[in-house]
C-alpha cells in the first residue's frame, strides 16, 4: 500500500483522470473529494461490500421458467399499451 501525506487542498492523481482531493481535516476526520469520469464507480468500502453481497444474493436467486414466462407476458401487455 502506498501511504502519502497530504494537507488540505492538496491532491493525489490516480492514472490520468482520477484526482483525490483533501477537502478538510478536523480532528480524526478527513474529508476527501473524488474527481473521476462518470463511468467510474466510486463507493465507500462498507457500501461497496453491501452492494457485492446484494449482487451475490441476486445471482443465487432461483427463478422458475414458468415465472419467466409470466414476466414476459406482463411486459408484452405493458408494451402493447404504449402509444407511439
UniProtKB/Swiss-Prot annotation:
The UniProt record lists the keyword Lipoprotein: no
A GO cellular component entry from the record: cytosol
InterPro entries documented for this protein: CsrA, CsrA_sf
GO biological process, one term: regulation of bacterial-type flagellum assembly
GO molecular function, one term: mRNA 5'-UTR binding
Pfam families on file: CsrA
Compartmental location: Cytoplasm
Main location: cytoplasm
Disulphide bridges: none
Alphabetical keyword list: Bacterial flagellum biogenesis, Cytoplasm, Repressor, RNA-binding, Translation regulation
NCBIfam families registered for this protein in UniProt: csrA, PRK01712.1
Role summary: A translational regulator that binds mRNA to regulate translation initiation and/or mRNA stability. Usually binds in the 5'-UTR at or near the Shine-Dalgarno sequence preventing ribosome-binding, thus repressing translation. Its main target seems to be the major flagellin gene, while its function is anatagonized by FliW.
Assembly with partners or alone: Homodimer; the beta-strands of each monomer intercalate to form a hydrophobic core, while the alpha-helices form wings that extend away from the core.
Family of the protein in this entry: Belongs to the CsrA/RsmA family.
Protein name: Translational regulator CsrA
Phylogenetic placement of the source organism: Bacteria, Pseudomonadati, Spirochaetota, Spirochaetia, Leptospirales
